[in-house]
């Protein structure tokens, strides 16, 4: 019993000693986060739980929210912390952001990768009009649904025949993209289709405002055409996910669809299979990136006409490893940590020491993906973290740095070994890299150069500043497909500064981040390097620095693209390749774009920063996809690293042709990061990855020198017979951001070998297009360019050859051909080959108002020109009608029959053959003689040139025979029905004097006037008092019409209507008095010779006759 009691204290002491030893061992252990918090999307008011597991487990765990420490639970914020668990009771706008857990122990601290908490939401559908979709019967129809913005991604539903379809069924196939494919469409599938978006977190459902109407048509034969997609597509997929490339074709007979990848048949790839005509790729990997071609053919038309291309990019989450050059660093020496990062797109990198972000300083030098600590001291001990993040995930790796006194020997323990990197953490959605301070991607290995000196001590141990960045002279483009000539020079050549010992040049392919940097050491006296074994049509980045006795100097950077190698099946022209690189120079399709399939631009590549002046820098970037609409502008934002705050707008409204801008007004000694956004008419892109930190060091004395690299002509186009339009691009970084004043454009006929034949146009400012006019028709021209400033001109650009259009003749001799513009032609697909130097006219949105105004004005002028002849005709018709009313058919009267009526006043009665003449009681009167020509009487009305003969009463006795033939009394019908007219016979003349009344026929007689070929005069005695009176009941306004007796026989050519003769015995009884009251009064409207008849008020003329003699 006593022995047992003595053994218990001993066992307890041993246990305490073992626990203490374990704790002491754990004190030197590197902390790790074994379970990272996961990004979450939650609805407003929902509960969010974030977990964090650390090793060793007894470590203290704290949390950060948007970079700020959370001191335990915050009731006001609604955040509760229990060791490794953070709970948000009710999510709101104030608790949305980025969270990190931090594990602390005496050896140091480590932070987890950030977890993003996002508020779920579902936006409304954009307003759209109804679309009519036509498809041939038996083919596949595609109904596209343009889902609104949603977090997380919305699920699509379709209204089909009054029923909502949530999953594929029957011949209805819902694709991952949200499109509805109707297989083997028939007449029964016609109708209206609408789609709806469903958010699985908020459980909201929103329906599109307009639907699409499907029409199924029947055709006899139609060539194959691809109805979806309508243009080349760029698809981004995360590694390990499945991918479906849609390709739907239509035609009669139904076409056959084939696929190819990078010019080779898709049959060689085992991971692909077909879903109808769509291509399905299981478990994508990096090797699945490339260009896929879908081709449809049915034997009708051109077999290669229906082609569409997909550009597939496989994104990979980051993979990080960190290395320490020396495990234990004596005080006063330098330590170098290298972080190797892989991922696509290239991840951004952030360095931390004991969970605190690091910035560049005199002792801490952040260069690419390396961290160098100069003159290590005890304060530099701790846990160093390399954290990488891109759009599809994040990862980090840690290493512990230990220091020792110079005279102390310390064996490295297990804690000095690098810690394996954590697996990549995929975000719940593409993360926002701008919300975390990071360093730009770069993989740095110690330079391995044969010219590297053995000692970097400066003579006299004087303090020397690092070498300045060299000036890169090479153009960012090369026509070579597998090599690139890199040319540079020292910034201050021949100066008394510390001499450069050697250069280190690194290059790597941007689109393939898994490749390591290729590093080359170049002697100080060599300023040229040829980079070989490059891939055609690929984007590369180059970083180089000069080394002097102070170590590595400032870095100069350039990005270039190699030339494309033509392929027999898939060929992309240089112009269209440039268009993909420079969305600002993109061609617009002549067809109306489908706005539903368009989107804001893609985020540009990470910008590079170079020194401009003491307080300014140049920010340079490379754009990506434009989302279907040309990029309208860029904007640059910056952020100070040592201050907490949001990103600040530095400048905006940067033209799409400019890929570099100077940012001024920076503070000395402050570290900045920059990012770029692209904007088109549909909105702005996501921000680019932030640049690496830039410290304003106060460099001054910059000299603006002559530009070396010239612009690059992207395409040319013949507008008409005498004009050629060209566009170009210019990257200031190719001339080390040297400012320029403008451009010189040189052109000459291609068949000329004399350089003096070049003509020069000058373009000033930031304009990147020009029209060369006054050229010769159907002539080929060589075109090249230079940029210039006060220092001189640059080297010549590439030479483009373009031929003007031929002059078109109308085919009529002696008439010059009309000036016509060539009709605009739709540009081909981006990836189809076209000879360099040709292109379609660039359609600009600013031309639309002028086009509308021109159409409206043209229509107005056309209407006016059309109505002027009509109005003139109407006026002429009215004038002619008015003239006819005054004298009907006067122009039709024959010249062979003319007459003149002159009133006889006071003519005494005379007789011929026992019949009295017309006469009067007093006065003198002259009567016009009726002239006859070959049996046809003449009238002065028809031929006013002939003067009538006048006779006085004394002469009438000798003209009895003529008078008898003239005083015949026909009655003019004047267009009225003669059968319905009553002949009024005058009573016996009481006074022996009768009145004879006469009036011309009105315009109704036009219908009865007919020309006659011959007229005959007949001598016939008439009674002087014979008259005819007509009354018409239908026309009460017309009281009477009287016609003097001219001649008898058939109607003459003078155009008078038939007359009616009345016997003398029945016509009138003569007396000594006047006419009875039953006589209607007649009117006579007439004018003198040479005047026209008009419908003026009637002039009453009376003829008195003596009583007849018995």
UniProtKB/Swiss-Prot annotation:
Location in the cell: Membrane
Stored Pfam families: fn3, I-set, Ig_3, ISET-FN3_linker
Function of the molecule: Component of a cell-surface receptor complex that mediates cell-cell interactions between muscle precursor cells. Promotes differentiation of myogenic cells.
PROSITE patterns membership: FN3, IG_LIKE
Gene Ontology terms: biological process: axon guidance; cell projection organization; cell-cell adhesion; positive regulation of myoblast differentiation; regulation of striated muscle tissue development; smoothened signaling pathway
Biased composition (Polar residues): 1075-1086
Induction text: Up-regulated during early stages of myoblast differentiation.
Description of how the protein assembles with itself and partners: Part of a complex that contains BOC, CDON, NEO1, cadherins and CTNNB1. Interacts with SHH, DHH and IHH. Interacts with NTN3. Interacts with CDH2 and CTNNB1. Interacts with CDH15 only during the early stages of myoblast differentiation.
Domain Ig-like C2-type: start-end pairs: 31-118, 124-208, 229-310, 318-402
Gene Ontology CC, one term: axon
Tissue occurrence: Highly expressed in embryonic somites, limb buds, dermomyotomes and in the neural tube.
Effect of mutating residue 1051 to Q: In strain: C57BL/6
InterPro entries (UniProt xref): FN3_dom, FN3_sf, Ig-like_dom, Ig-like_dom_sf, Ig-like_fold, Ig_I-set, Ig_sub, Ig_sub2
Main location: membrane
Cytoplasmic face residues: 872-1110
Protein name: Brother of CDO
Extracellular side: 26-850
Bias (Pro residues) ranges: 421-430, 814-828
Keywords (A to Z) from UniProt: Cell adhesion, Disulfide bond, Glycoprotein, Immunoglobulin domain, Membrane, Repeat, Signal, Transmembrane, Transmembrane helix
Disulfide pairings: 52-101, 145-195, 247-294, 339-386
Topology relative to the membrane: Single-pass type I membrane protein
CDD domains, alphabetized: FN3
The species this protein was found in: Mus musculus (Mouse)
Region (Disordered): 407-458, 561-610, 809-828, 1065-1110
């Amino acid at each position: 019993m006593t022995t047992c009691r003595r053994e218990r204290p001993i066992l307890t002491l041993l246990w305490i000693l073992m626990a203490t030893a374990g704790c002491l061992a754990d004190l030197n252990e590197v902390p790790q986060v074994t379970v990272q918090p996961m990004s979450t999307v939650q609805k407003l008011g929902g509960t969010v739980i974030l977990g964090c597991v650390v090793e060793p487990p007894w470590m203290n765990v704290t949390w950060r929210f948007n970079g700020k420490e959370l001191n335990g639970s915050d009731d006001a914020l609604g955040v509760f912390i229990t060791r490794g668990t953070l709970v948000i009771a009710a999510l709101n706008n104030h608790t949305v952001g980025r969270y990190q857990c931090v594990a602390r122990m005496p050896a140091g601290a480590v932070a987890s990768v950030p977890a993003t908490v996002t508020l779920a939401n579902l936006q409304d559908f954009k307003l759209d009009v109804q679309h009519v979709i036509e498809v041939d019967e038996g083919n596949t129809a595609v109904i596209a649904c343009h889902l609104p913005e949603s977090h997380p991604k919305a699920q699509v539903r379709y209204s089909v025949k009054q029923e909502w379809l949530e999953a594929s069924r029957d011949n209805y196939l819902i694709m991952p993209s949200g499109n509805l494919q109707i297989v083997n469409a028939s007449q029964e599938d016609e109708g209206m289709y609408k789609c709806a978006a469903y958010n699985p977190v908020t459980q909201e459902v929103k329906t599109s405002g307009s639907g699409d109407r499907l029409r199924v048509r029947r055709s006899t034969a139609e060539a194959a055409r691809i109805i979806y997609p309508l243009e080349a597509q760029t698809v981004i997929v995360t590694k390990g996910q499945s991918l479906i490339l849609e390709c739907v074709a239509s035609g009669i007979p139904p076409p056959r669809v084939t696929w190819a990848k990078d010019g080779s048949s898709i049959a060689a790839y085992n991971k692909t299979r077909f879903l109808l005509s769509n291509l399905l790729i299981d478990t994508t990997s990096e090797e699945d990136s490339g260009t896929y071609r879908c081709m449809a053919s049915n034997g009708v038309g051109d077999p290669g006409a229906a082609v569409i291309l997909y550009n597939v990019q496989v994104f990979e989450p980051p993979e990080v490893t960190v290395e320490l050059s020396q495990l234990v660093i004596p005080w006063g020496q330098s330590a170098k940590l290298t972080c190797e990062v892989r991922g696509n797109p290239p991840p951004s990198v952030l360095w931390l020491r004991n969970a605190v972000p690091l910035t560049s300083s005199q002792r801490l030098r952040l260069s690419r993906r390396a961290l160098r600590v100069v003159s290590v001291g005890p304060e530099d001990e701790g846990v160093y973290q390399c954290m990488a993040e891109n759009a599809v995930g994040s990862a980090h790796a840690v290493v512990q740095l230990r220091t020792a006194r110079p005279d102390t020997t310390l064996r490295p323990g297990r804690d000095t070994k690098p810690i394996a990197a954590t697996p990549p953490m995929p975000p719940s959605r593409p993360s926002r890299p701008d919300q975390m301070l990071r360093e730009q991607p770069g993989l740095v290995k110690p330079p391995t150069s044969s010219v590297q000196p053995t000692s970097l001590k400066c003579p006299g141990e004087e303090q020397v500043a690092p070498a300045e960045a060299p000036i890169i002279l090479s153009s960012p483009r090369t026509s070579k497909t597998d090599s690139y000539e890199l040319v540079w020079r020292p910034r201050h050549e021949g100066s008394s500064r510390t001499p450069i010992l050697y250069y280190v040049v690194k290059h790597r392919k941007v689109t393939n981040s898994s490749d390591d940097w290729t590093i080359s050491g170049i002697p100080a006296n060599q300023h040229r390097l040829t980079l070989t074994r490059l891939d055609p049509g690929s984007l590369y980045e180059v970083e180089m620095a000069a080394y002097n006795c102070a170590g590595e100097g400032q870095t100069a950077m350039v990005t270039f693209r190699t030339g494309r190698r033509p392929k027999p099946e898939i060929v992309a022209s240089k112009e269209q390749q440039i268009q993909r690189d420079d969305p600002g120079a993109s061609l617009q399709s002549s067809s109306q774009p489908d706005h539903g399939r368009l989107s804001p631009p893609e985020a540009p590549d990470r910008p590079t920063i170079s020194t401009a002046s003491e307080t300014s820098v140049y920010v340079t970037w490379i754009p990506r996809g434009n989302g279907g609409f040309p990029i309208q502008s860029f904007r640059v934002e910056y952020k100070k690293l040592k201050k907490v705050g949001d990103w600040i707008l530095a400048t905006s409204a940067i033209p799409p042709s400019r890929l570099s801008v100077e940012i001024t007004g920076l503070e000395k000694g402050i570290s900045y990061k920059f990012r770029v956004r692209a904007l088109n008419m549909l909105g702005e892109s996501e921000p680019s990855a932030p640049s690496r930190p830039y410290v304003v060091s106060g460099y001054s004395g910059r000299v603006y020198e002559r530009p070396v690299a010239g612009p690059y002509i992207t395409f040319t186009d013949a507008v008409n017979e005498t004009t050629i339009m060209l566009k170009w691009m210019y990257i200031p970084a190719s001339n080390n951001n040297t400012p320029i004043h403008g451009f010189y454009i040189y052109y000459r006929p291609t068949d000329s070998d004399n350089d003096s034949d070049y003509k020069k146009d000058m373009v000033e400012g930031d304009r990147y297009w020009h029209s060369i006019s006054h050229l010769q028709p159907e002539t080929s021209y060589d075109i090249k360019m230079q940029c210039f400033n006060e220092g001189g001109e640059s080297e010549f650009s590439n030479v483009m050859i373009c031929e003007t259009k031929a002059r078109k003749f109308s085919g009529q001799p002696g008439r010059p051909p009309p000036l016509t513009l060539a009709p605009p032609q739709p540009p081909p697909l981006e990836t189809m080959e076209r000879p360099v130097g040709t292109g379609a006219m660039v359609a600009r949105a600013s031309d639309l108002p002028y086009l509308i105004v021109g159409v409206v004005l043209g229509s107005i002028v056309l209407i006016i020109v059309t109505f002027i002849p009509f109005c003139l005709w109407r006026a002429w018709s009215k004038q002619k009608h008015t003239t006819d009313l005054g004298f009907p058919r006067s122009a039709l009267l024959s010249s062979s029959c003319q007459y003149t009526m002159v009133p006889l006043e006071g003519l005494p009665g005379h007789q011929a053959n026992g019949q009295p003449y017309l006469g009067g009681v007093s006065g003198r009167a002259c009567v016009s003689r009726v002239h006859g020509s070959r049996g046809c009487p003449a009238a002065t009305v028809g031929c006013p040139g002939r003067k009538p003969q006048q006779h006085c009463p004394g002469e009438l006795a000798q003209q009895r025979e003529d008078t008898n033939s003239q005083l015949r009394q026909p009655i003019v019908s004047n267009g009225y029905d003669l059968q319905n007219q009553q002949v009024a016979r005058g009573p016996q003349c009481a006074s022996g004097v009768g009145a004879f009344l006469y009036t011309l026929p009105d315009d109704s007689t036009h219908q009865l006037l007919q020309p006659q070929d011959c007229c005959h005069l007949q001598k016939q005695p008439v009674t002087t008092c014979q008259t005819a009176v007509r009354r018409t009941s239908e026309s009460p306004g017309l009281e009477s019409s009287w016609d003097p007796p001219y001649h008898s026989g058939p109607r003459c050519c003078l155009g008078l209507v038939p007359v009616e003769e009345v016997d003398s015995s029945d016509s009138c009884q003569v007396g000594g008095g006047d006419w009875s009251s039953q006589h209607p009064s007649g009117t006579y409207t007439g004018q003198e010779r040479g005047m026209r008849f008009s419908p003026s008020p009637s002039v009453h003329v009376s003829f008195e006759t003596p009583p007849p003699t018995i």
